[in-house]
């Protein structure tokens, strides 16, 4: 219950914890309590916003997202950064005064920006569907929650036209959860932990250490950023692969259901 409340508070502050909340609603048996706590927090936030005259701003984190271009650090922007360095596709890096961030523009960049939000929604829907299948097949929440949380968080990072150094810190939550739950029979999270550390190191190089070189399209920094973004994709693929593996397991039948099914068979044998 308290986890649902905390995830809801986090989602209203920074959006991405909504992925953790969604994973909890799918994977945990106590999803009713999680949902009730999240709804209670959300109602309190909405009521407070309306009371303070900020009703029109409640959904700005989502509505403002749709109008953005391709931010420099997002994985999808990598192609246009290399094109800008090569003098192709009329690509260039510019500073958007409206939202105070560096973005990339070039042939096809606006189409890519327009497609990223619906693509992100589709990827999240697919991941949640896999999680529901795994839960219905009786996969234990100790195994399902860390993998599903990581998959959703990595989708929010990887399939996103927005990029930021803080995104690398998001990975810590599902990775720490996975490492902690290994002791209770959860899957090994050594690979995600190592990848997360490498991603953090590369991100530190990108920003703030050598960000000026990146904006100047220094090929060495483009290699660093490309490697970091590729590792985002690898980590997403790892999580989805393990999620599919959980879905592929034979269905687990609870002991109560199994006992109920066995009773008629034993009665028939005795008669």
Regions found by a protein language model. Give the residues of each.
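Short helix-capping/linker segments at secondary-structure and domain boundaries
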Residues: 87-89, 182-183
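Multi-pass membrane glycosyltransferase architecture that uses lipid-linked
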Residues: 1-63, 112-271
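Extracytoplasmic catalytic/substrate-binding loops of multi-pass membrane glycan-assembly enzymes
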Residues: 70-76
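N-terminal leader/capping segments at the start of a protein or of a new domain
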Residues: 65-68
């Amino acid at each position: 219950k308290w986890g649902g409340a905390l995830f809801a508070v986090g989602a209203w502050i920074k959006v991405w914890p909504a992925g953790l909340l969604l994973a909890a609603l799918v994977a945990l048996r106590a999803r009713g309590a999680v949902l009730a706590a999240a709804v209670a927090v959300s109602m309190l936030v909405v009521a407070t916003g309306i009371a303070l005259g900020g009703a029109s701003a409640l959904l700005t984190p989502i509505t403002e997202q749709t109008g953005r271009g391709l931010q420099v650090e997002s994985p999808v922007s990598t192609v246009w950064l290399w094109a800008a360095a090569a003098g192709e596709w009329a690509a260039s890096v510019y500073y958007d005064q409206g939202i105070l961030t560096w973005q990339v523009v070039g042939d096809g960049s606006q189409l890519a920006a327009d497609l990223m939000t619906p693509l992100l929604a589709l990827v999240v829907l697919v991941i949640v569907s896999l999680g529901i299948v795994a839960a219905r097949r009786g996969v234990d929440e100790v195994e399902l929650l860390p993998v599903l949380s990581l998959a959703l968080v990595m989708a929010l990072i990887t399939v996103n036209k927005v990029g930021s150094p803080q995104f690398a810190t998001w990975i810590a939550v599902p990775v720490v959860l996975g490492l902690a739950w290994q002791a209770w029979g959860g899957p090994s999270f050594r690979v995600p932990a190592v990848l997360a550390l490498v991603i953090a190191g590369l991100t530190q190089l990108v920003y703030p250490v050598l960000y000026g070189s990146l904006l100047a399209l220094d090929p060495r920094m483009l290699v660093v950023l490309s490697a970091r973004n590729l590792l985002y994709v690898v980590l997403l693929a790892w999580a989805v692969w393990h999620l599919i593996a959980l879905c592929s397991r034979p269905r687990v039948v609870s002991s109560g259901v199994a006992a109920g099914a066995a009773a008629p068979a034993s009665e028939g044998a005795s008669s």
